[in-house]
């Protein structure tokens, strides 16, 4: 999940620097931009890109949620399939500028849409995996937990290393994305795709057995009964018969003999 946070930093750098200040993963930024643009408070603020990105992000998250609706908690083949799909979408998006270019507003909106679709599916998958404080797309809640549980706050100190790593990786991803965008935005998206596909391969190798369906195994009570009943019968029945039968016979038989005439 931390590696996916790095990939989000790369993708958001591409969106902001090359796609008219659009955030593909951080929807808070898009909502704020749309709010300012709606009031006319900011001239030249983009509208089409943030709207398209927001709608595509929701579509990706809803699709992943539907796929994982009946999945068991934790990693499963469905998680692997979804993250693999995210990697493929990012790969196709990386090839887009080389094929159709990214010089028109329509091309940029289409690229922002595919990136946001992928990030929405990734975020929903990360939510299902439920790694604490690692949403892969934002670090606001991560920073909140880091500060609140620090020595200056509640002094719990739980998850500090993981939270710090998540923040550092999204910063590193944004920096890497900005550097790669100086060469070509497609190269930056391709780097993010490689990270996601690597995470998918490693996750599938680590947990290949589960299919994502909830467990329907019968309870273990019948097995316990079947294993203990013969033992109880074999241990109690002979001892009861051997201990009670002779004593009964010896105590009752003499009393029934008639005296001789």
Regions found by a protein language model. Give the residues of each.
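Hydrophobic/small/kink-forming positions within alpha-helical transmembrane segments
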Residues: 54, 58-62, 91, 167-175
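Hydrophobic core of transmembrane alpha-helices in multi-pass small-molecule transporters
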Residues: 2-11, 16, 20-23, 89, ...
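Long, intrinsically disordered low-complexity tandem-repeat segments
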Residues: 213-256
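A membrane-interface helix-boundary motif in multi-pass transporters
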Residues: 75-81, 178-194
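Helix-to-loop junctions at the C-terminal end of transmembrane segments
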Residues: 60-76, 176-177, 181-182
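Substrate-agnostic recognition of the 12-TM MFS/MFS-like secondary transporter fold
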Residues: 31, 41, 117-174
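Cytoplasmic-side transmembrane-helix entry/capping segments in multi-pass membrane proteins
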Residues: 75-86, 108-110, 133-135, 164
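Symmetry-related core transmembrane helices of the 12-TM Major Facilitator Superfamily/SLC fold
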Residues: 83-89, 93, 113, 187-204
